[in-house]
Amino acid sequence: MSKNVPNIRILMAVGLFGVMLGTVGLPIYLHAPKYFSDTYGVSLASLGAIMFALRVVDFVQDPLLGRLSTIGFLPRRLLSAGAGAIIIIGALGLFIVTAPINPTIWFALSLILLFTGYSLSVILLYTHAVNNFADKAQTIVARWREAGQL
């Protein structure tokens, strides 16, 4: 495939993808800790420590997800759909399903799913951009994704 600059239709799709990813962030960082604190009595300090620890896990897993996205044993569309499904399952676990186990552990498990799905989605987006668009288009794609997240 030739490396070119994406057309406006593709950029709008990237922006819409950014909107979807942006809607995940606010509930995770603002609403989830308060919800778990109010509903289950888990201290905000504990929830903050869990969130920090999971960001460290995310730091380690992101290169592995990047490798997964380039191996090619699964079609990227399937990986992308899987990432979206993981985000949905994590969000349902966080806000809809009553914690069937210790709420602190349930919070951590739900966030692991959300962070993994989010990271894989972003990695797949940028992998697609690198593989399909010219170098000068990378910042354009990033700009549209970030604008969508705002």
What residues fall within each predicted segment?
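Membrane-embedded alpha-helical bundles of multi-pass transporters/translocases
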Residues: 1-150
